[in-house]
């Protein structure tokens, strides 16, 4: 066995608050070996990120380590150090140097006021005894290693290919300017994937022994996620680093981890080799996490959730009691049922018709005039039948969200037609447009920013009723709100609480209840589960399907996660650069994708299958 570089023993972390104490970590233990990747997986609130912050010595007040040890070996054959007992000044010598961390949201991790070069150089000089010019070269080398910058040879080749008359003596200067131009760029000028590469370059710039990656790909598209995972894996192997990879998605863990620790409510409930965890999970929580992710190979009527595998209750003394359950096998939707459903839609008149729709955003010139338009939606046409779910997939920037908001007239189109129930609504204004809002609703991506934090949940759900004068009395409206909250799986007394008092999944249920308040016919779900843990995501997806059946709803389901879209959709449109590049039934798109772009999206989905786990281990060998 390889040398142990980090060993956590019986670690306990508590957060005292208002006379109550929340135990975020309850005696967790694990070991990390040189060159190994340990995956830590669990839902929000399980203690994953608190574990990382405790190792880094970055726990926020009032969080405190109340017990246990964190033993770190800074050099081979050196004595281990207990990081818990290390004075803050000595801890600073290791943090960012020997132990580095990549955070979940790169945009909030970088200072928008400074260019990326300044921030990289600052981090390097803080941990290494080098001059500013040396730090600059290390920063450039780091950006090349994470493939944000091409190598010197590739830059030279680019210049020689674009200009046959180029003076070779000018190449060194051009290469230098090209590299320095990247250092001069600011965070807002880079995409999410590029920003995460900057964060990775910063983390590895001081040659850490341990790299902690806390949900480093959660905010990224599946294709960008796949390239970042491959990059992290490559860097780890080339540098022989030990790595802790934290995520809520077991599918991702299967792509990168050698060992896995599954966390639930501050405890490690199962741990072992990655292939063992995926081929033969023992704990009901692990089984639930694996089962709740939509499969590309099967089409169940509903997804299994963690609650199908276990129940958890706290005793009067605060002891957590987990009771395993045997889940009922999910009923598969047959090929005949799918064909009959599609045939039924084909016989119906469209509810929504889109004809040659174009949406552009003006690019301003130096003097404020419009130079040109950036076409977010460029000549899109399709129909949506009553009762069906049309999936809309593509990477960030492909135009899917702009298209969804344009259909609701939240963004004005440049040209084309939006026809709803045989009425052209493209130019509707005033009262006719307001009446249309009753029929067409949207559930946004982030449930927290969708709800006013100053409004009680009941008032938020009631607001559409007041705007459209629905319900004769306040009592009638409150009864309607209570009915809606109960229908989405919340108690009626939830109407007296504020958004911050709910979990992410519960907040999204509130948003769904609000979208149903006016009995709409058509709802756009815009990345409405992408901000949720996979287990909560499964619950919300099941709810959306139930509501569609109960209320005869028509959905457009927008997402970058193709496995989720396949579970939800009857037909799928694939968007790229403002255009529909492929469309068909959900089954045909997945079984026989025609376009290379669609094939790339499908190949990038982390499945968590035993075969993918075995392939990962073969690559590692």
Task: Enumerate the predicted regions with their spans.
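ABC transporter nucleotide-binding domains
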Residues: 1-621
């Amino acid at each position: 066995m390889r040398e142990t570089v980090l060993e956590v023993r019986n670690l306990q972390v508590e957060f005292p608050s208002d006379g109550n104490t929340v135990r975020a970590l309850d005696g967790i233990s694990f070991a990390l070996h040189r060159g190994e990747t340990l995956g830590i997986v669990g839902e929000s609130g399980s203690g994953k990120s608190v574990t990382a912050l405790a190792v880094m010595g970055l726990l926020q007040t009032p969080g405190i380590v109340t017990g246990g040890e964190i033993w770190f070996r800074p050099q081979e054959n050196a004595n281990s150090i207990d990081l818990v007992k290390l004075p803050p000044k000595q801890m600073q010598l290791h943090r960012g140097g020997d132990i580095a961390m990549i955070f979940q949201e790169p945009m909030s991790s970088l200072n928008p006021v400074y260019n990326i070069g300044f921030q990289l150089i600052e981090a390097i000089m803080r941990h290494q005894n080098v001059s500013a010019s040396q730090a600059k070269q290390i920063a450039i080398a780091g950006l090349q290693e994470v493939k944000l910058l091409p190598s010197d040879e590739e830059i030279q080749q680019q210049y020689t290919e674009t200009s046959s008359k180029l003076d070779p003596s000018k190449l060194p200067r051009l290469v230098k300017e090209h590299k320095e131009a990247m250092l001069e760029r600011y965070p807002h000028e880079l995409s999410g994937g590029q920003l995460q590469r900057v964060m990775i370059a910063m983390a590895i710039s001081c040659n850490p022994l341990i790299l902690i990656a806390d949900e480093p790909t959660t905010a990224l598209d599946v294709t960008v996620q796949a390239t970042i995972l491959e990059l992290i894996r490559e860097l780890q192997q080339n540098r022989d680093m030990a790595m802790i990879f934290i995520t809520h998605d077991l599918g991702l863990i299967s792509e990168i981890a050698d060992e896995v620790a599954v966390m639930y409510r501050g405890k490690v409930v199962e741990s072992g080799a990655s292939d063992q965890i995926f081929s033969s999970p023992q704990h009901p929580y692990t089984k639930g996490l694996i089962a709740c992710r939509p499969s590309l190979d099967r089409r169940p009527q509903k997804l299994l959730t963690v609650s199908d595998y276990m129940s958890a209750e706290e005793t009067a003394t605060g002891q957590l009691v987990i009771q395993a359950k045997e889940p009922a096998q999910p009923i598969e939707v047959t090929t005949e049922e799918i064909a009959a459903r599609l045939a039924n839609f084909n016989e119906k008149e469209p509810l929504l018709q889109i004809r040659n729709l174009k949406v552009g955003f003006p690019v301003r010139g130096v003097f404020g005039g419009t130079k040109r338009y950036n076409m977010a939606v460029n000549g899109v046409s399709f129909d949506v039948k009553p009762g069906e779910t049309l999936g809309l997939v593509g990477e960030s920037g492909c135009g899917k969200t702009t298209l969804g908001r344009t259909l609701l007239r939240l963004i004005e189109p440049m040209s084309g037609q939006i026809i709803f129930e045989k009425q052209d609504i493209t130019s509707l204004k005033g009262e006719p447009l307001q009446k249309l809002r009753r029929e067409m609703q949207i559930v946004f991506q982030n449930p927290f920013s969708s709800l006013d934090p100053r409004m009680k949940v009941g008032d938020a759900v009631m607001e559409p009723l007041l705007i459209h004068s629905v319900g004769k009395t306040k009592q009638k409206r409150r009864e309607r709100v209570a009915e809606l909250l109960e229908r989405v799986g919340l108690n009626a007394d939830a109407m007296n609480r504020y958004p911050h008092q709910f979990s992410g999944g519960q907040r999204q249920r509130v948003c769904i209840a609000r979208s149903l308040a006016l009995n709409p016919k058509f709802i756009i779900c815009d990345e409405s589960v992408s901000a949720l843990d996979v287990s909560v995501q499964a619950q919300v997806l099941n709810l959306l399907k139930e509501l569609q059946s109960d209320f005869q709803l028509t959905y457009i389901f927008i997402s970058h996660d193709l496995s989720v879209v396949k579970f939800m959709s009857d037909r799928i449109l694939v968007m790229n650069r403002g255009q529909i590049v492929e469309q068909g039934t959900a089954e045909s798109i997945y079984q026989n994708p025609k376009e290379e772009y669609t094939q790339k999206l499908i190949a990038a989905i982390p499945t968590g299958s035993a075969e993918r786990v075995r392939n990962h281990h073969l690559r590692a060998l």
